[in-house]
């Protein structure tokens, strides 16, 4: 089932937000993010000693007159970042009355919009089974985004997803921006290899875990018949009492804590969001506090 989640009014309200990148930026010239490498922009960064073969037009003759030594001016290189967004389209993302799929699309669309507002490239992929489906491919600029936004609303959710198996064989870039994984991470299939792979490629990794209100704080009590949304062959008949609810909460804390710790150890960002959170709360609150947005 596809989710109609985004409207133009919402995108206009988030236009002023800017994404904050932690790692060095490298890529095609044209974007307006400053990397920590040196290049040919007009913004002065530092000096270094002149060596034979250097461009003499970059010599600082004032420094030579003062120190009787040749110094080369270094400038910040402004390069284009490529934001790559991966959306888990497994059946658990749309299970029951959950709004996880809708939230995933809104977060993906907002991050993509903020990126194109900065003239960065954006690609959006759907994780389906063990492969990626490219929804938006390397667009630059707001006009291109507006022309492609309908594709996000047409994403179909269902089936399984294998995050690592899908991402590892794909082209992920190297040191050229942010990689965002949006999922409920409620799967027996591993995601760790994907995070490690992206981090090793010097990408700024940002994992967003979306859970429904019921998953975060289940209110069900008494006899229940539970169905595994990721495996239709698994069902559970339980009597849910106070102790079961307490054990569930402990298990949930373990799962979310494990992802958080795994990301932190790799200098990756991790966000736990409720499907019922307003996107304004997520972007104007949580992501600003985390330093992902400024």
Regions found by a protein language model. Give the residues of each.
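A short glycine-rich, His/Asp/Glu-containing loop-to-beta-strand
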Residues: 58-60
């Amino acid at each position: 089932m596809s989710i109609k989640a985004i409207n133009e009014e919402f995108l206009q309200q988030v236009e002023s937000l800017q994404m904050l990148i932690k790692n060095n930026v490298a890529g095609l010239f044209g974007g307006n993010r400053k990397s920590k490498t040196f290049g040919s922009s007009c913004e002065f960064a530092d000096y270094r000693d002149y060596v034979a073969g250097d461009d003499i037009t970059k010599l600082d003759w004032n420094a030579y007159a003062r120190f009787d030594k040749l110094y080369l001016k270094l400038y910040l290189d402004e390069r284009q970042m490529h934001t790559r967004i991966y959306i888990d389209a497994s059946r658990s993302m749309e299970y029951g009355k959950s709004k996880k799929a809708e939230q995933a699309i809104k977060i993906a669309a907002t991050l993509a919009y903020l990126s194109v507002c900065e003239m960065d490239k954006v690609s959006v992929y759907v994780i389906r089974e063990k492969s990626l489906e490219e929804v938006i491919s390397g667009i630059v600029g707001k006009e291109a985004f507006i022309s492609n936004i309908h594709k996000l609303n047409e994403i179909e959710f269902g089936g399984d997803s294998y995050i690592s198996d899908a991402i590892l064989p794909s082209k992920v870039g190297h040191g050229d921006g942010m990689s965002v994984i949006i999922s409920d991470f409620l799967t027996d299939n591993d995601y760790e290899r994907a995070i490690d792979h992206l981090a090793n490629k010097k990408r700024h990794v940002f994992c967003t875990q979306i859970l429904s209100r019921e998953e975060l704080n289940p209110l069900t009590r008494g006899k229940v018949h539970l169905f595994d949304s990721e495996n239709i062959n698994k069902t559970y008949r339980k009597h849910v009492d106070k102790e079961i609810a307490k054990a569930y909460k402990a298990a949930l804390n373990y799962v979310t804590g494990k992802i958080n710790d795994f990301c932190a150890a790799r200098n990756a960002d991790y966000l736990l969001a409720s499907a019922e959170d307003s996107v304004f709360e997520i972007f104007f609150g949580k992501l600003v506090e985390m330093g992902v947005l400024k």
